[in-house]
Every structure is written in structure tokens, then in C-alpha cells.
């Protein structure tokens, strides 16, 4: 049996925590589908490495175009960094790096190196100034193509960037996607 659910917020719905339905749609808590966790890395205004734990993104492409599509709130400093610098990296940590990846939330400060402070290693990128994370087996370097609000009046913006370079560890270079996912331990 399927339940038919209206998409408007029910009047009797209690928030998970204060403001949770202002930051997220209430449907995010009902229609939970697993997404790959990534660390979106940028440079702060002072040049320090920034790392944003992220799960609202996808990769899509056609022919010679491969695009990173992210959803970000306009008041996050990662969003401001992307608009200012016009670039970022999407780094995919394995399960082994999840503790450090989640630590980026706790070491999120205006001027510090969030990557190093979370126990990860900054790695230079090849085509962009945004740093990569050495421990991640897959990193995609991206340049901003466009950004726009999700809907009128939303603080959530869609950000699209062309992937201009890919760094991939030997352990995940195989062509079989199932083997790659297993090796990456996503």
C-alpha cells in the first residue's frame, strides 16, 4: 500500500529542532534517500582552506561536459567563497575519513584551515586554486558556470560548475563502477 502525501507542510507537524523546517524542507525528513557525502573545498577570503561537509550534490554530464551541481544556502561561507573565487573541489571521502569529515563542522571558523584542523591533509589542485584533500580517493576540480535560487525567495541556491580536472587514486581507477564504489568505501 502506498501513502499519498501532500507536499505542503502539515499544520500539526513538530520540528525536529527549532528552525529545522526553515533550513530544510520538512520533506527532507520524510523522503530520505541516501546521497554520497562529499567535502566541498574552497579558499576563504584570507586564503585559508575551507571544507564543507556536503550531501546535496550530484555529477551530471553529456559529451565533453561534466558538471558538479550543488545546492547551498546563500548565507554559508562556502557559497560566498565559490562566488568570490569562481571555483571549488568536490572530494569524496571513504568511510575511513568520516570522523575527520564530520569534524569539519566543529572546526568551522572564519579564518582557520578547516582541512588541517579536522585532521585531514591539504593537497594542491592542478587547475584551480581551491585545495583538494589528499586522503580522498576522488577529487573533482570545478569552475563556476552559473548559480540561481532554487525558487523565488529561497535562501537555497543551485550552483553549477564545469569539472575541469579529476584526480583519482590508483585503487579506484578500474572501469567497473561496482568495483570502484567498493574500493572507495562510500
Task: Walk through the language-model features, giving the residues of each.
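Basic, polyanion-binding surface patches
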Residues: 1-186
